[in-house]
Amino acid sequence: MNRTDQLVRPNVRALVPYSSARDEYEAKDGIFLDANESPFGPLNRYPDPHQRELRAAISTLKGLPEETIFLGNGSDEVIDLCYRIFCNPGTDRALIFPPTYGMYQVSAALNDVEVIKVPLDENFDIDIPAVTPFLEDERLKLIFICSPNNPTGNSMDPGRIEFIIRNFRGVVVLDEAYADFSGRHSFIEKIGLYDNLIVMQTFSKAMGMAAARVGMAFASPDILKYFFRIKPPYNISTLNQEAALQRLRDFRPITVQTDTLIAERRRLAEKLVAIPVVEKVWPSDANFLLVKVRDADTVYDKLTGRNIIVRNRSREIAGCLRITAGTRGENDRLLDELGKINI
């Protein structure tokens, strides 16, 4: 039994996966009388349960073998499957670095997994001295790292990330949802080096397909075989697979749009610091900015009252709003309305 198998829950190791009709017969042509589908209608056939065409396109884009690619119904499904595969309910633990993406903790609660919280340091980076004692905990199975981090926007020090991967006995899940805006190297280049690393990316951010719900996980085949084993058989609809494929057929608009958003993020940061109600704007590697303002609740209410919706993060980070970089026109309207607020 290899290291990955030892980390997996015994019932998951022993699970005989559901075999769908399209697992047993993969060809596209024929008279299909095997899946109890209607013979009528434009969307009458079940989708490809393994998303072969889409995974092949992603393989070409990322330069990775198809067997190292898993697709989820959004990254939230990948997060949930991590808990289901590796954590025994009521026994095992996961670790997060708050303030960070909230679904790590929500999924843990749904799966009855205890969460250890190691707050980020004063620079919103990983506190290595604080986390190191937990790395030998035999009950700790998962560590979630978000880089660039939501809601702070910064990338974690890659050396600190790698220190955790090398020294942790369990699985490290690195969430790179915003990596396309950072200009940094992705850790997908390292999945061949580390058998305990899962890297998540998404179609929701730079690719502009949040409505389609397509999340990506990159890891060793030894890990991903369990994801394919326990996932629902048809977790990505035909419509969403086709939409993602269409988006990948011409990548130039995505690159242009990403560059535009990075430029707007920088411009927005420069303009925000001149507004009286703004106290601080943190550097960002994402498509948003963390902004400290005077009386965040009041500023939030005034902006939403003018149909400008930002995210109030003052409960997690005192006095802070998270502001997404929009179009130039949207950003100018935000700046104009924010400049009118007197507190």
Regions found by a protein language model. Name each.
Residues 1-61, 139:
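N-terminal "arm"/small-domain region of PLP-dependent enzymes with the aminotransferase-like
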Residues 52, 88-145:
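PLP-dependent aminotransferase-like
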Residues 55-93, 111:
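Phosphate-binding glycine-rich loop
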Residues 65-69, 90-93, 139, 176, ...:
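Short acidic capping loops at alpha-helix termini that bridge into adjacent secondary structure
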Residues 109, 126-138, 151-172, 176-206:
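Active-site pre-lysine segment of PLP-dependent enzymes
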Residues 159, 302-306, 315-343:
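PLP-dependent enzyme catalytic core of the Aspartate aminotransferase-like
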Residues 196-274, 280-281:
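PLP-dependent aminotransferase class I/II
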Residues 261-262, 274-306:
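Conserved PLP-binding catalytic core of the aspartate aminotransferase-like
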